[in-house]
């Protein structure tokens, strides 16, 4: 395959950063509407944004067009992971999923590099690895993750005293602890952390005090991850970390218990980052599919021309 090299547009003043080893951590906290994350106190996300920026973005493709995509979780993840909408990646629900692996996910691109790129996945939903990214499947590229923490939600021996929502919360905590430990000790070049608790509370209770509490709780998990990155950066000053925190969909306006449609609140998400280079919302709107090319640019990945041509988004990093 012919290659596309993503040029680094930074000036000579940034040469020291260019010479550092790029690292990326992206975190998906499930089902938090933009209006909620903007209203509730979130010191963890605020700490990330203090170094970079926050902006609203959208999911769901273009209304009434072939790219229109359901605003549900697996669809949001796959749109981020592949930089495409449902009409390409073929994920339209959380179950009965048959991804189109012709559209490379970001970890497949990472493993396609001439240099060794280590990868990590820390997830409360095992299907992210086994189905969405087709872990080890030849059709999906055949790659395996170097660091994995998942499967707890399927293990009956894990937190058996808890039921349903509280058990998933315990899984989120375990996933965060292991992710933070791995970041600090091993620092995979590209890592994804997925946490579910907020969506569970949204479905159960909708908008209100319990959702606000869940957001504050999951923000504390973000703070744990951010603290690990900060500690790692102080120890290894040659690493250049991009941290992105986002969500996969919004919620209905009626009571916040549902999602999946094309209302403004369901389509509106947000992107928080530690990068001061993120484009201003005044310059252009952002979408979840823009995260993929943003990571590609920061990591200085080469992509096959065919893969680059399939992307729906564009990098959010400015000159």
Question: Which stretches of residues belong to each language-model region?
Answer:
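Metal-dependent active-site segment of extracytoplasmic phospho-/sulfohydrolases and closely related
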Residues: 25-26, 44-45, 217-259, 295
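Catalytic-site neighborhoods of secreted/periplasmic enzymes
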Residues: 87, 91-163
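Active-site His/acidic residue clusters
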Residues: 134-137, 149-151, 177-224
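Active-site rim elements
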Residues: 92-97, 209-212, 277-286, 304-305
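Active-site-proximal N-terminal segment of extracellular/periplasmic enzymes that hydrolyze or transfer
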Residues: 4-54
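Substrate-binding rim/cap in mid-to-C-terminal beta-strand-loop elements of soluble/periplasmic
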Residues: 75-77, 81-84, 259-303, 317
């Amino acid at each position: 395959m012919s290659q596309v090299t993503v040029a680094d547009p930074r000036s000579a003043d940034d040469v020291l950063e260019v010479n550092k080893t790029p690292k990326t951590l992206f975190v998906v906290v499930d089902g938090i509407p933009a209006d909620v994350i903007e209203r509730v106190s979130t010191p963890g996300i605020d700490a990330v944004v203090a170094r970079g920026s926050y902006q609203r973005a959208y999911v769901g493709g273009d209304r009434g067009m072939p790219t229109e995509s359901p605003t549900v979780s697996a669809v949001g993840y796959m749109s981020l992971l592949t930089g495409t909408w449902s009409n390409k990646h073929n994920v339209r629900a959380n179950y009965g999923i048959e991804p189109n692996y012709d559209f490379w996910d970001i970890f497949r691109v990472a493993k396609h590099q001439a240099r060794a790129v280590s990868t990590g996945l820390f997830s409360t939903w095992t299907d992210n690895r086994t189905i969405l990214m087709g872990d080890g499947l030849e059709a999906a590229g055949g790659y395996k993750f170097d660091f994995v923490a998942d499967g707890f939600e399927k293990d009956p021996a894990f937190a058996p005293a808890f039921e349903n929502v509280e058990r998933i919360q315990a899984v989120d905590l375990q996933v965060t602890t292991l992710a933070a430990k791995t970041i600090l000790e091993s620092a995979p070049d590209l890592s994804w952390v997925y946490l579910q608790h907020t969506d569970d509370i949204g479905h159960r209770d909708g908008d209100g005090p319990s959702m606000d509490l869940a957001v504050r709780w999951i923000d504390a998990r973000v703070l744990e991850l951010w603290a690990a990155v900060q500690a790692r950066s102080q120890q290894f000053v040659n690493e250049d970390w991009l941290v992105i925190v986002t969500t996969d969909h919004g919620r209905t306006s009626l009571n916040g218990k549902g999602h999946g449609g094309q209302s403004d609140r369901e389509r509106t998400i947000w992107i928080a980052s530690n990068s001061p280079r993120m484009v201003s919302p005044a310059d252009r709107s952002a979408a979840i599919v823009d995260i993929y090319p943003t990571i590609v640019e920061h990591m200085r990945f080469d992509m096959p021309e065919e893969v680059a041509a399939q992307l729906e988004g564009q990098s959010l990093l400015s000159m």
